[in-house]
C-alpha cells in the first residue's frame, strides 16, 4: 500500500511538471530559424520526430555541419542506451578501430552531394517512432530506418537499421559482450 502511494505521488509530481500538450506542439517553425548543425538538431528534437530526423540529415548537406565530433558515448542525438554502447565500444577498442567507425545516421564516413529524398515517420506511441529514410550520398541511394525514442522533452535515435545488416545495437552488443 505504501509503495503504491509513493508511486502515485511520484507520477502526480511528474504530471504536474509536464507542459500542457498544446504548448508542446506549437513551435513547429523553430528549427527553420536556426542554421543547420547541432543547435538546429537539438531544437528540432523538442518539436517532433520528423523535424528531428530532417534536422539530422540537413547537416550532411552542409560541409562540416555537425562541427567537431563529441566524445564517443556522449552525443545528445542518441538515447542513453545507444550512447552507453557506443562509449563501451570505443573504450573496449583501446586505441584500435572500434566497431562503430562511421556515422550511423548516413551509414558513411564522408558525405558529398548529399540529398535527402524522403522521410516517412510512423509514431507508435507518444515516446516511440520509426523513420524510414531515403537519401543520396556520393551518388549512391541509401535506405535505412531510425528507431526513435523521446527521452524527456527530446527525440533521440535509439537504433539504426540498414537493410541486410544486423541492427546497430546488435552489432555493438556483440562487440562489447
Spans of model-derived segments:
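Sec-dependent bacterial lipoprotein signal peptides
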Residues: 1-15
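Juxtamembrane proline-rich low-complexity "stalk" or linker regions positioned immediately after a signal peptide
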Residues: 23-38
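Surface-exposed, charged secondary-structure patches
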Residues: 79-140
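Hydrophobic/aromatic beta-strand elements that line small-molecule binding cavities or substrate pockets
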Residues: 120, 144-150
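Low-complexity, intrinsically disordered terminal/linker segments enriched in charged
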Residues: 124-127, 132, 138-142, 159-177
Amino acid at each position: 500500500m505504501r509503495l503504491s502511494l509513493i508511486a502515485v505521488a511520484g507520477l502526480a509530481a511528474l504530471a504536474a511538471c509536464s507542459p500542457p500538450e498544446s504548448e508542446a506542439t506549437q513551435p513547429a517553425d523553430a528549427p527553420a530559424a536556426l542554421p543547420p548543425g547541432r543547435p538546429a538538431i537539438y531544437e528540432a528534437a523538442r518539436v517532433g520526430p520528423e523535424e528531428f530526423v530532417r534536422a539530422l540529415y540537413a547537416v550532411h548537406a552542409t560541409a562540416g555541419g555537425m562541427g567537431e565530433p563529441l566524445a564517443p558515448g556522449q552525443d545528445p542525438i542518441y538515447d542513453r542506451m545507444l550512447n552507453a554502447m557506443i562509449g563501451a565500444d570505443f573504450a573496449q577498442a583501446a586505441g584500435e578501430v572500434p566497431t562503430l567507425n562511421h556515422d550511423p545516421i548516413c551509414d558513411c564516413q564522408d558525405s558529398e552531394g548529399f540529398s535527402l529524398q524522403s522521410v516517412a515517420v510512423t509514431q507508435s506511441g507518444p515516446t516511440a517512432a520509426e523513420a524510414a529514410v531515403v537519401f543520396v550520398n556520393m551518388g549512391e541511394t541509401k535506405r535505412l530506418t531510425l528507431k526513435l525514442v523521446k527521452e524527456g522533452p527530446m527525440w533521440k535515435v535509439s537504433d539504426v537499421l540498414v537493410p541486410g545488416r544486423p541492427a546497430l545495437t546488435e552489432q555493438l552488443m556483440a562487440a562489447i559482450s
